[in-house]
Amino acid sequence: MPIPRKELPNVGEYVIATVKEIFDYGAYVTLDEYNGLEAYLPWSEVASRWVRNIRDVIRENQKIVVKVIRVNRRRKTVDVSLKKVPENEKRRKMLWWKRYLKASKIVELVAEKIGKSIEDAYREVVWKLEDYYGDPLLGLEEAVIRGPDALREAGIPEEWIEPLYNEALRHVKVKMVKIRGLMFLRSYESDGVERIKKILLSAKEILDKVGDNVKGRIYLLGSPRYVIEIIAPDYKEAEKVLKEILTTTEKLAKELKVEFRFERERK
């Protein structure tokens, strides 16, 4: 179980809980993010609609998302609500927790390999990635895409960088998107081939300047058709690069009196 950053949650916080015991008047749950801290879920906070049996809504050992509604810091007691958690928040929190656990396990594995304690793993890596990226796994994904500098930016100590980066490459798979299109270039001038080469070179220079998280290539499909292919972490980034390429090449084509046309690949 991950090490908690603080002893008790704050009122209004959404937390992951495991249903421990169910009674006629409510249930006791343990908070996964707080080292199994016990919290009380009153009957009145189980569901917004009337239910005959609390077990129609929850069951023992079930993972649920609850909202903290009361905290007694002196007695270290916590009350939570299930009915005050919106559906979208349930999905968001569950996904975040799943990703947090995966990132934590990767960092703990690296800690064991380099002789660091579990406490060091969280203090020096997991929490720093969380603070910088909002999600430790997102930090590892950025490292896979952009390289070790993504870890350095978050303030990770240098002794962690190489082993953590290598472990991320083994365990973190980043989904990439690809967009393609056909660029038609035709010139009737005597030096038309050279003019087209200049246009293609201008496009290649743009691809060479984009960050490590974007890959692209331009190749001849059969004169006068050239394929433009952009691979990026998301469509927004891919479209941004494609737009820059098309704006630059179309402008240059007009200057060089080269016929220009672009067609998006149909899916």
UniProtKB/Swiss-Prot annotation:
The S1 motif domain, residue ranges: 12-83
Keyword Protein biosynthesis: yes
Gene Ontology MF annotations: ribosome binding; RNA binding; translation initiation factor activity
Pfam families with a match to the protein in the record: EIF_2_alpha, S1
Keyword terms: Initiation factor, Protein biosynthesis, RNA-binding
SMART domains: S1
InterPro entries: NA-bd_OB-fold, S1_domain, S1_IF2_alpha, TIF2_asu_arc, TIF2_asu_C, TIF2_asu_middle_sf, TIF_2_asu
Key word RNA-binding present: yes
Stated role: eIF-2 functions in the early steps of protein synthesis by forming a ternary complex with GTP and initiator tRNA.
Protein family: Belongs to the eIF-2-alpha family.
Subunit structure, interactors included: Heterotrimer composed of an alpha, a beta and a gamma chain.
PANTHER family: EUKARYOTIC TRANSLATION INITIATION FACTOR 2 SUBUNIT 1
Protein name as it appears in the record: Translation initiation factor 2 subunit alpha
Annotated source species: Staphylothermus marinus (strain ATCC 43588 / DSM 3639 / JCM 9404 / F1)
Name of the encoding gene: eif2a
